[in-house]
Amino acid sequence: MLMKPVKIKDKILKLPIIQGGMGIGVSRCRLAGAVAKEGGMGVISTAQVGYDEPDFEKDPEGVNLRALPVQIRKAKETAGGKGLVAVNIMTVTQLYEEYVKTVCEAGVDAIISG
C-alpha cells in the first residue's frame, strides 16, 4: 500500500504515521527523534518527562517544564531535519498553559492534546 506524504503548514510528513504519546519514560527524545528521522511524526509525552532528573521529587512540575525543551532539542537533532517532532499534553494537566507556552518557545512542530 502506497502512503502519500501529508503537508502540515510548511512541513511534510514523508511517512504519514504519528507515533502515540506514551508517558513516564517511553515517549521521549530517542523514540520521537527516531520516528521523525524515518519521516513520521515523533511524539514526546509530557507525563513525568523529567522523572529521571535528580530534583524531580522536590519539584516534579518544574522539572518536567525544564526537561521539555531539552527533550525537543535532542529529538530534533536525532531527526536531522526530517519528519516532525510533536508533544502530547493532557488537557487535565494543572499547568497546561505553561506546558503549551514552554513547548512552543522550544520550537515544537505540533501539539497533540486530549
Language-model segments: residues:
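Active-site entrance/lid segments in N-terminal catalytic domains of soluble metabolic enzymes
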Residues: 1-114
